[in-house]
């Protein structure tokens, strides 16, 4: 939210800033630390373990510093940040993955299936940041690597986190269990991951790969919407509660997926990624 406000202010008052800098304020400085913070809260719930230690707040802060570093590169051309920022982001993600792994092992019984979505989303972030780091030392491949970075982060890191969290939050908000959620999360993760990687690789190097990728990614979204309607009926759409926004997030992900497919085919613009 803060990132979005800063981006709007930047667009209004900092006309010399490139669009890439402003969008990285929104997604890197805004969304990335927020997702780390959300995972920090939900991981103990999903593993039935104690609250996260206070020291773990350093991870979202490190992610924010990495994001501000890449914004500084785009806005002011500070070359050192182009190399340092992706590495700092990768380090933050790997440390966080290690913490999730420790909580996983400490869990009595099996952790909630959503935890696998979080771990996979973080792995996608590592891939995306590694790609953008490589683009600095492999300038001939910078375009494809940036395209891979864009799609593996939006559909992988942000998308997988959103899909997993949505299936935990919606029953909580409605006060009604969804007995199919755990089975659906376990069954749909391979399809969503395959779709993410196919779209990212296709957008970077061979666009026809994005078509089966989009189908693989969209199938779990359609199944989630159908199961939600079957389990809860019209209740999620009732006003004065958070559930309409949660269900609408499925539509938002579908729009992102559609734009990703068009971008990979060369019909949509993402020059400022």
Where are these regions (language model features)?
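Hydrophobic alpha-helical transmembrane segments of multi-pass integral membrane proteins
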Residues: 1-273
């Amino acid at each position: 939210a803060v990132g979005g406000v800063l981006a709007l202010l930047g667009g209004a008052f900092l006309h010399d800033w490139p669009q890439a800098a402003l969008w990285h304020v929104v997604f890197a400085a805004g969304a990335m630390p927020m997702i780390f913070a959300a995972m920090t809260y939900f991981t103990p719930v999903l593993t039935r373990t104690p609250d996260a230690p206070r020291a773990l707040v350093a991870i979202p802060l490190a992610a924010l510093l990495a994001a501000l570093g890449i914004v500084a590169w785009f806005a002011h051309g500070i070359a050192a940040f182009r190399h340092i920022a992706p590495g700092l982001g990768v380090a933050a993600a790997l440390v966080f993955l290690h913490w999730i792994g420790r909580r996983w092992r400490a869990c009595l019984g099996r952790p909630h299936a959503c935890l696998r979505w979080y771990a996979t989303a973080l792995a996608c972030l590592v891939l995306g940041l590694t790609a953008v780091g490589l683009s600095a030392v492999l300038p001939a491949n910078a375009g494809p690597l940036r395209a891979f970075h864009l799609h593996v982060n939006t559909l992988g890191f942000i998308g997988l986190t959103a899909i997993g969290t949505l299936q935990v939050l919606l029953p909580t908000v409605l006060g009604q269990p969804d007995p199919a959620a755990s089975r659906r999360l376990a069954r749909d993760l391979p399809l969503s991951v395959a779709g993410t990687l196919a779209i990212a690789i296709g957008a970077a190097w061979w666009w026809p790969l994005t078509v089966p990728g989009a189908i693989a990614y969209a199938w779990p979204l359609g199944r989630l919407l159908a199961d939600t309607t079957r389990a809860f009926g019209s209740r999620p759409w009732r006003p004065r509660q958070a559930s309409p926004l949660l269900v609408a997030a499925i539509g938002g992900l579908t729009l992102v997926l559609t734009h990703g497919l068009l971008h990979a085919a060369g019909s949509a613009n993402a020059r400022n990624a």
